[in-house]
């Protein structure tokens, strides 16, 4: 039993219809092909007909072009139909292509596995072939580690044996005495200094450095230095120092009066901000 090609059966119907319509169309156009010969013999008549029947001439040229192209298209359609009939089924081709792809993947995977195995073998052979190098490297690292602490210990000993400067010794002593940090010393008046010395000379067991430090709100080290010092100012220096402290007292008193914490006084009035900004008449300077 003969096999029927589905593609050829689908393509035969339009080709037959095209051939039928083409034959009818060419039969109608055959008597109208005379102007083509008149173009060479009678140019005046051709120009007259072209002006009169311009649309008819354009349709004629289009029909001629269609007629020249149609045999080529019909021939190509017939060739396509024959090719479709002669080719195998698509399912078989897909199966073959899938089989080829699977075979190629299998070969690629086996090749990759073989390359990995060869690389591992090379690595293993390299590591086995060079145990001496590994041993030497480990020995060198051990020696460097053992020598490191020795070098640091020697450097620390050299630094400790080196003679220290006086300012370094004093700095370390101050750090030990002032563990909470170095704070600026509190300014004590000459009367306070004299009072500290007098109290300590009268009752040294009762007025110790720690007690005096709590009383005058300074560090015990500052009290020890005050008691230890043997320097005494002269009469002129004492008078100058006393005047300076009196001015400081009046200035602080004027600031307290502006805040409302102290009563007004004539001595502190000259240090007030109002006295600095305005004169006695109340005008701004």
From Swiss-Prot:
* Record key words, sorted: Mitochondrion, Transit peptide
Write out the ranges of the annotated region (Disordered): 89-165
Record localization: Mitochondrion
Query: Which intervals carry biased composition (Polar residues)?
Result: 89-128, 137-149
Gene Ontology CC: one annotated term: nucleus
Q: Does the keyword Transit peptide apply?
A: yes
Q: Which domain of life is it from?
A: Eukaryota
| Similarity-based family | Belongs to the RRG9 family.
Q: Which PANTHER family match?
A: NEUGRIN (PTHR13475:SF3)
User: Which purpose does this protein serve, as stated in its record?
Assistant: Required for respiratory activity and maintenance and expression of the mitochondrial genome.
The protein's name in its UniProt record: Required for respiratory growth protein 9, mitochondrial
Question: What organism is recorded for this protein?
Answer: Aspergillus clavatus (strain ATCC 1007 / CBS 513.65 / DSM 816 / NCTC 3887 / NRRL 1 / QM 1276 / 107)
Name the gene for this chain: rrg9
